[in-house]
Amino acid sequence: TNIFGADTPAGDYLEGLYFAADAGVKTVAFVYAKTDFGEDLAAASKRKMEERGLQLVLIEGYPPEQRDFAALAKRLGEVNADLIFGVSYLDDSIALVRALKKEGVNPKMLGFTVGPGLREFANQLGADAEGVLGVVQWLRSSREPGAQDFAYRFAQRYGYNPGVYAVMGYSAGQILESAIRLAGTTDHDAVREQLRTMYFRALIGPYNVNETGRQQGRRNFVLQWQDNQRRLVAPEQVAERPLIYPLRATP
């Protein structure tokens, strides 16, 4: 192959979330935006959650542009799952949280993909963001080598904090540079062989691929909004705070 992945494949994206079973979760409602990303995660997560003994009581997709979630929130309340998880983006995750609050749905655990990793999530939701989980590929507090330094230098240069795409781009450059150094040449075949076989710790985390070029060396992190801050709660080696579970019901 000539394509090598540095980020977590969709099939493994939610691996860090499966600690939910250890926390006491028994039932899961899974909703997702009908994008390629959402549908890939839905298929993989359905299989893996069932392997871990978690019962899926609802799995439902919605158009990515949807913002009215009143009907979906009502169905989620009816199934009364311990965990509600959404494969979503910023605007739809915010809209879904608001709909759940309006409907009075209070799961023991609530999480999303992209939305909670962004500061705007809590800026818009205020206290309703408290306790919500997010799955992220990188956070500057993750203790990855160079994370704090990169975040500082990026903010100094561009005037805002780096997002995951900046980290991915920088990491891809690190990985390619390392492969060229190990190969001792820019010859295509020699560099490709290093990319295929090498182990390297980039800013985004460990790089190690299988025979198809699929990333298998790294796993995502799980954060939780606590006291208006994003705090890592899993995996254990990067956790800053213990998980709040179950969530405190709010009116």
Spans of model-derived segments:
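Extracytosolic ligand-binding ectodomains
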Residues: 1-251
